Amino acid sequence: ASPGELTEASGVSEAVARKIINTARSRLDMGFESGLDLLKKRESVVRISTGSKAFDALLGGGIETGAITEMYGAYGSGKTSIGHQLAVNVQLSKDKGGAEGIALWIDSEGTFRPEFIQRIAKASGLDPEEALKNFKGARAFNSDHQMLMIEKIDELITNGAPIKLVIVDSLMSHFRSEFSGRGQLADRQQKLNRHLHELLKLAHTHSVAVYITNQVMAKPDMFFGDPTEAVGGHVLHHASTYRCYLRRGKKGSRVAKLVDAPALPDGECIFMVTDDGIKDL
């Protein structure tokens, strides 16, 4: 935390805040690490299966802990359905594509459906009632409420809750409705930036996978190709570790295009959204 953030949170003076931060830094080993040490840390990363082998392969094994994975696309492209699948799969053992933990869902659009969780759980060999017990969800009614929930999640994990997946569906809904017009764009992006950094800190500190869904808009000045573009601007584009564009395909299928990833090539895969969750074509 910065001195300003500590002052705002605790009420101490900035001088005291600086002293606290310097003391904490002196007690931490904040030196550089070798590439081999960093590689060993990467070996502890867990990847949660999407339910589709083709989709998992596109993402390098699944949704990664310690990272933010963003899926954006038009209405009905499968973003929320993937979230439901992940909320079940995170409960599975690691050898079955899970993380042996629970999911926490921040719902800004009222799209979570517990009955879908039950159907996916049954198809995955889990007890539907137990799957719902191993799940926490909350409705966010504005952007401040949404941001406050991230602080609450950090507190829950610190107190021992085995949360391994945080789902925000959707990230931008409240930000778009509360900050309208170009005159408020700078304020919106600044607030969004703070929110994203809290999500990143949560992912890195607690080795949690963060899955966010995002809305899209059409670029009016684009006459050729797909005019669809994710909302949120460069602030969101840079914060997401993995970014996928989802769209409808032929005969009810969905197409996922990997747009950005640290060490993976761009690519596409096809998957299905069924009554029992995400499946291969």
Predicted ranges, named:
Residues 4, 8, 18, 22, ...:
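Solvent-exposed alpha-helical segments within well-ordered globular domains of core cellular machineries
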Residues 7-10, 20-130:
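The Walker A/P-loop phosphate-binding site
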Residues 13-14:
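Small-residue hinge/turn detector
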Residues 48-52, 56, 65, 80-81, ...:
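Amphipathic alpha-helical transducer elements in NTP-driven molecular machines
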Residues 61-63, 93-99, 124-131, 155-161, ...:
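Conserved catalytic network of the ASCE P-loop NTPase/AAA+ motor domain
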Residues 73, 107, 139, 170, ...:
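Flexible glycine-/small-residue-rich
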Residues 98-184:
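Conserved inter-motif catalytic segment of the P-loop NTP-binding fold
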Residues 189-281:
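Phosphate-binding/switch region of NTP-binding enzymes
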